[in-house]
UniProtKB/Swiss-Prot annotation:
Localisation per UniProt entry: Nucleus, Nucleolus
Family from the record: Belongs to the GAR1 family.
UniProt protein name: H/ACA ribonucleoprotein complex subunit gar1
Cited InterPro entries: Gar1/Naf1_Cbf5-bd_sf (IPR038664), H/ACA_rnp_Gar1/Naf1 (IPR007504), Transl_B-barrel_sf (IPR009000)
Ranges where the record places region Disordered: 1-36, 125-209
Domain of life the protein comes from: Eukaryota
Lineage, top ranks: Eukaryota, Fungi, Dikarya, Ascomycota, Pezizomycotina
Gly residues bias: start-end ranges: 1-29, 142-209
Function: Non-catalytic component of the H/ACA small nucleolar ribonucleoprotein (H/ACA snoRNP), which catalyzes pseudouridylation of rRNA and is required for ribosome biogenesis. This involves the isomerization of uridine such that the ribose is subsequently attached to C5, instead of the normal N1. Pseudouridine ('psi') residues may serve to stabilize the conformation of rRNAs. The H/ACA snoRNP complex also mediates pseudouridylation of other types of RNAs. The H/ACA snoRNP complex mediates pseudouridylation at position 93 in U2 snRNA.
Subunit annotation: Component of the small nucleolar ribonucleoprotein particles containing H/ACA-type snoRNAs (H/ACA snoRNPs).
Keyword terms: Nucleus, Repeat, Ribonucleoprotein, Ribosome biogenesis, RNA-binding, rRNA processing
Length: 209
């Protein structure tokens, strides 16, 4: 559906090209095409060229995968999605043209298309609703210790051990959508929850016989 550092300048609107789309993998090269999909859907319209790439405005309610192949209406491949930019309610994306395709050969308003299997629903990048007040998260319970055998009969063993494990850590706040370009205002930075939870609860101490 990584994080790139410095921005690449040159957008007509002055947007930063460092569009950090939460959880994005590294920029992959062009892979061998297995052929166009049986059906292509309109993804967006060409706006202008920038540094050899095509800047497009999305007209699709869904979000394209990074590196998703992009086609003309006749299913001729022209390149792959390189960046997703803009606020969550107005998405832009860039296309890295494949060999033989020149970004400046397109005119503003030219339509580009994508396979339906290369789209993600917008809801996937929105924060999940908070649980209702008063609800408590389920806690994992550690197993009890066993009984040790052997040795002469004596008094009771050591008192029960304390609970193990560090206190539960909380992750960072959930993100919203996409970072990067400042087209029409700031977007939301995507991403999954931050740091994981703490270690599981330790078992109780055993009794010696």
């Amino acid at each position: 559906m990584s994080f790139r550092g410095g921005g690449r300048g040159g957008f007509a609107s002055g947007a930063n090209r460092g569009g950090n789309f939460g959880g994005r993998g590294g920029r992959g090269g062009f892979q061998a095409q297995t052929g166009p999909p049986a059906q292509v859907l309109e993804m967006g319209t060409f706006m202008h060229a920038c540094e050899g790439e095509m800047v497009c405005e999305s007209v699709n309610p869904k979000i394209p995968y990074f590196n998703a192949p992009i086609y003309l209406e006749n299913k001729t491949p022209i390149g792959k999605v390189d960046e997703v930019l803009g606020p969550i309610n107005q998405v832009y994306f860039t296309i890295k043209p494949q060999e033989g395709i020149v970004a400046t050969s397109f005119k503003p308003g030219d339509k580009v298309y994508i396979g339906g299997d290369k789209l993600l629903p917008l809801e996937k990048f929105l924060p999940k609703p908070k649980p209702p007040p008063g609800s408590k998260p389920k806690k994992a319970v550690g197993g009890r210790g066993g009984f040790a055998r052997g040795g002469a009969r004596g008094g009771r063993g050591a008192p029960r051990g304390g609970r193990g494990g560090a206190p539960r850590g909380r992750g960072g706040p959930r993100g919203g959508g996409f970072g990067g370009g400042s087209f029409g205002g700031g977007g939301f930075r995507g991403g999954s929850r931050g740091g994981g939870r703490g270690g599981p609860r330790g078992g109780s101490g055993g009794f010696r016989r």
